[in-house]
Design a protein with these regions (language model features):
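N-terminal Rossmann-like FAD-binding beta1-loop-alpha1 element of flavoenzymes
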Residues: 6-34
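Short, solvent-exposed loop/turn segments at secondary-structure junctions
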Residues: 14-17, 39-41, 105, 161, ...
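Glycine-rich FAD pyrophosphate-binding loop
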Residues: 25-51
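Mid-domain catalytic core of redox enzymes
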Residues: 27, 221-338
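Dinucleotide-binding Rossmann-like beta1-alpha1 core, especially the glycine-rich loop
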Residues: 53-129
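Active-site/ligand-binding neighborhood in enzyme catalytic cores
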Residues: 94-99, 104-235, 239, 246
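Short FAD-binding loop at a beta-strand-to-alpha-helix junction that anchors the flavin cofactor
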Residues: 339-355, 365
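Internal hydrophobic alpha-helix adjacent to the cofactor/substrate pocket in enzyme cavities
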Residues: 363-383
């Protein structure tokens, strides 16, 4: 690939693909063809006003943008303004409600005590020491080594097993990298400097991002139905499932998916917060979402509620969470080797790299990859 290359095909119009499309069109002046199999852009981050209530509903589950990286924040603010929403998460456990992540409020409510920060720290250290786990072999042992048994059994075990559809002792330890604990009464979920929801919704953000005249967006367009009509060695940004790109030749990668049951209720407020985790194993859904709370600057007389259910997806279902067992990672390593043999294709996004990425990471990795590709193009080297 060299500087004569003037066209790029982008497969998927989520954050990764949309950032790439915007950068190639706006900065390099290239023609960009975006192929999106759904009937809208935005991927799983898409949101749109509910026709019955006017409430902005996140079709594929809540997405709260949060970052401490100024570059990504400034980049997205070209296409949207954000409100001042600050995310909180609450959890229901045996009929009682607790704030997450773990902090003084949750610990003291659970124990029925009034521990100071120092006392809570000593209590947690004793909890962890009691387990005596130096080298965790699975998710359960990893969690016990971080927070101890009391918090784990109250808030993590049943919720995690419900979400993943597996026993915590069967899940790999690296699914949990950390379990944040704040020994304060701060119940804000994120620590990032910038947080919020686009004031006009994610749909408007993506539409503006892709509005450049050099960008052609084709909706309802499955790449795999069109691939034989595309240039064989033209530059491509691919954000679909990496295993499908290579026709599952090394096997399928493991995923979990979620589905949502929607209710429109003729009341002003259903649960008093945007997200409620359901920690009890006998409750079939994992979370309850109430979207009006994402826009506290607006008022509505009705409300929209989603109940979230986790399940093992079929081959045609949407993939949400990579399982990444040892077997999955062995398969993925083979696909990484395959990807190196197609240097004109840049794999990115959650599906393309088989990793869970939040929006901030997706935007920042797309911007970084674009700079890498741009530099390769200018130098006349292979770019992906």
């Amino acid at each position: 690939m060299d500087s004569r290359q003037k066209t790029v095909v982008v497969v998927g119009a989520g954050f990764y693909g949309s950032v790439m499309a915007e950068r190639f069109a706006n900065e390099l002046g290239w023609k960009v063809l975006v192929l999106e199999k759904r009937d809208h852009v935005g991927g799983n981050c898409w949101s749109a006003p509910d026709p019955d209530t006017g409430i902005e509903v996140h079709t594929y589950g809540p997405h709260i943008f949060h970052t401490s990286h100024e570059l990504g924040w400034k980049y997205l603010n070209q296409f949207a303004s954000f409100n001042n929403y600050r995310h909180t998460v609450w959890a229901t456990r045996k009929g009682k409600v607790y704030p997450l992540p773990f902090g003084l409020a949750a610990i003291n409510l659970l124990l029925g005590r009034r521990l100071s920060p120092a006392e809570a720290r000593a209590w947690m250290q004793a909890e962890v020491a009691r387990e005596g786990i130096a080298e965790p072999r699975n998710l359960e042992e990893k969690a016990l080594s971080l927070i101890g048994r009391t918090l784990y059994e109250a808030f993590v075990k049943e919720y995690t097993e419900k979400h993943w559809g597996m026993k915590a002792t069967e899940l790999p330890a690296y699914i949990i990298t950390r379990l944040p604990v704040r020994l304060t009464y701060d119940v804000g979920y994120y620590n990032d400097r910038w947080q919020g929801i686009p004031t006009e919704g994610y749909g408007a953000l993506f539409n503006k991002m892709l509005a450049h005249p050099n960008i052609e967006v084709r909706l309802n367009s499955d790449y795999f139905s069109l691939r034989n009509s595309l240039p064989a060695h033209g530059l491509m940004v691919y954000t679909g499932p990496i295993d499908r790109f290579f026709d599952y030749k090394h096997g399928r990668l493991g995923w979990r998916s979620v589905r949502f049951e929607k209710q429109v209720l003729d009341i002003e407020d259903y649960q008093g917060t945007s997200v409620m985790n359901e920690c009890d194993g006998d409750v079939p859904f994992t979370r309850t979402h109430e979207f009006k709370h994402f826009t506290p600057e607006r008022t509505f007389k009705k409300t929209v509620v989603f109940r979230e259910y986790s399940y093992l997806p079929g081959p045609d279902d949407d993939m949400y969470y990579p399982v990444r067992t040892t077997a999955d990672l062995a398969i993925h390593a083979k696909y990484i080797d395959e990807a190196r043999r197609v240097p004109h294709v840049a794999f990115g996004g959650r599906l393309g790299v088989y990793a869970y990425l939040d929006m901030e990471n997706t935007v920042s990795t797309a911007l970084d990859k674009y700079e890498e590709l741009k530099n390769s193009i200018v130098a006349g080297r292979t770019g992906a």
